[in-house]
Curated annotation (Swiss-Prot):
This is Small ribosomal subunit protein eS27. Binds 1 zinc ion per subunit. Keywords: Metal-binding, Ribonucleoprotein, Ribosomal protein, Zinc, Zinc-finger. Part of the 30S ribosomal subunit. Belongs to the eukaryotic ribosomal protein eS27 family. Pfam families: Ribosomal_S27e. PROSITE patterns: RIBOSOMAL_S27E (PS01168). GO terms for cellular component: ribonucleoprotein complex; ribosome. Zn(2+) binds at C22, C25, C41, C44. It comes from the Archaea. It comes from Pyrobaculum islandicum (strain DSM 4184 / JCM 9189 / GEO3). GO terms for biological process: translation. A zinc finger (C4-type) spans 22-44. The gene is rps27e.
Length: 67
């Protein structure tokens, strides 16, 4: 009796890098989706992402999700 081989599933990460636009100055900056620290805009200093214990809460506009 032949043995059936099942497909080996490779786990993919759920976290991603996200390009965010600052609502005040329009600067685009790359932020980690599960940021553990407060992320501020490099130009004006506004908070773009704040940690929540899992995914970060984004305050800017998401421009692109980087793969």
């Amino acid at each position: 009796m032949p043995v059936k081989f099942s497909k080996v599933l490779i786990p993919q990460p759920r976290s991603k890098f996200i390009k965010v636009r600052c609502p005040d100055c329009g600067n685009e900056q790359v932020v980690f989706s599960h940021a553990a620290m407060v992320v501020r805009c490099l130009v004006c200093g506004r908070v773009l992402a704040e940690p929540t214990g899992g995914k970060a809460r984004l305050a800017g506009h998401v421009v692109k999700i980087l793969e």
